[in-house]
Amino acid sequence: MPLASIYADLSGFTDYIDRAIELGMIADAVKALHVIREEFQNVVHDDFGGRKVRFIGDCIHALHAEGDHRETNSEETIMEAAKCAGAIRSSFELCKSALVGVNELGLAVGVEYGQTPISKIGIQGDRSVRVASSKTTSVSEAMQKSCAHNETRFGPEVLKLAPVALNDLISSDGMAGDLQFDDVSTAVSAPAVAEVAAPYARAHAPSAVADTRAHLEKK
């Protein structure tokens, strides 16, 4: 079935690690990586009902689809994938405001839509691993790699199928700049997330929601 493939990768991470080694801040760097990766996964899974395929170092590969067991709603899938991509960036900005020494990091995001088989390998249960491989996943990764320090880029199939409101945010080559959740939500005239279940707080949720994220709690 067709679905949306999302790659989100930290840019400048190698330089960040080199600097952390020089300054003796390895523990802070390891903490930052784990917090940011957990935040990415929580946005994908808890906020948007998507699935993480895997982490590749400081990069997450995720999948999203809207519809039923018979067919995928392409327009809804693309809209929600765009919101998810924006929410990942918004939550990344929240992480940057709470963690030490990560202000120079950027985030490159690539999104594409198309047929993608999904399976699992390994021992059934916690020891199994989700796998997904297709032209769509390859293109979404290529879109991510073509981004500069803080950009989001959509693939050609997204450009063909995206609603007009979303296309207004995207250039002819798929670039969408520093795209965040509020940008997409406003463009498609969708209400912002009204409620977020505790203990998670989201940068893309209404400001009235208290920041109760345990791993971002200020001391």
Regions found by a protein language model. Give the residues of each.
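Intrinsically disordered, glycine/charged-rich C-terminal tails and inter-domain linkers
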Residues: 125-131, 139, 148-219
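Serine endopeptidase catalytic core focused on the charge-relay Asp
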Residues: 88
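Alpha-helical oligomerization segments
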Residues: 142-143
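Polar, enzyme-active/binding microenvironments
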Residues: 92
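Acidic, glycine-rich loop-and-strand cores that form catalytic or ligand-binding grooves
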Residues: 83-84
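Catalytic NTP-binding/metal-coordinating core of nucleotidyl cyclase/transferase enzymes
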Residues: 1-80
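Catalytic core of nucleotidyl cyclases, primarily class III adenylyl/guanylyl cyclases
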Residues: 44-76, 95-133
